[in-house]
Design a protein with these regions (language model features):
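Short, small-hydrophobic-rich alpha-helical interface motif
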Residues: 14, 28-39, 62, 131, ...
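C-terminal edge and immediately downstream basic/flexible tail or linker adjoining helix-turn-helix-like DNA-binding
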Residues: 2, 133-136, 151-170
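Helix-turn-helix DNA-binding motif, specifically the short coil turn and the N-cap/start of the second
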Residues: 24, 127, 136-141
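Σ70-family region 2.3-2.4 aromatic/basic alpha-helix that recognizes the −10 promoter
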Residues: 36-40, 51-73, 146, 150
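A short, charge-rich alpha-helical start-of-domain segment used by transcription regulators
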Residues: 1-16, 26-29, 40, 44
Length: 170
């Protein structure tokens, strides 16, 4: 398989994660393009040198870092058009559409540290170890952020402002 074909096999997963991070199709496509450009410009790292052992984790790390850099840098305001067009072939029911809108809104309320981990584990089906490598954080941090993120999502989806706190019994 050629190098460009290897990278192209990852585009759907990168795009899905980028869309969840960025919140709209245009920014997600820009993020995927920047990720692929970075990967191609550093092809010697993953092509044969062995420096990159897990291409998937490395690509998601690159995307994560580019996304964080993009958040830090002020952007010019852009007008997004036609972002509400569904990408699925079968139209969802009204209830499904509302559930997705509610979930997206709840995800947007999560701190970015929790949101990224929830998306990588739930949407991209990454293991805790892979997320740890991708985000360059300890696996315990992955587990605690995931737990807090899931609980916060649950609370938001149930209409509660705050997650239920367990009482400490002495």
């Amino acid at each position: 398989m050629h190098d460009d074909q290897i990278l192209l096999t990852w585009v759907p997963r990168l795009r899905r994660y980028a869309r969840a991070l960025a919140g709209n199709r245009d920014d997600a496509d820009d993020l995927v393009q920047d990720t692929l450009e970075r990967a191609w410009s550093r092809a010697s790292l993953w092509r044969g040198s062995g420096e990159v052992r897990d291409l998937r984790a490395w690509l998601f790390s690159v995307m994560h870092n580019l996304h964080v850099d993009g958040i830090r840098q002020p952007k010019l305001a852009t007008v997004l058009m036609d972002d509400d067009t569904p990408e699925v072939a079968v139209a969802p029911t009204q209830g499904e559409r509302l559930a997705v809108i509610d979930l997206q809104g709840a995800l947007d309320l999560l701190p970015i540290e929790q949101k990224e981990i929830v998306l990588l584990v739930a949407l991209e089906d990454m293991s805790y170890a892979d997320v740890s490598v991708t985000l360059a954080i300890p696996i315990g941090t992955v587990m605690s952020r995931l737990s807090r993120g899931r609980e916060r999502l649950r609370a938001l989806m149930e209409g509660r402002d705050e997650p239920v706190r367990l009482k400490v019994v002495k």
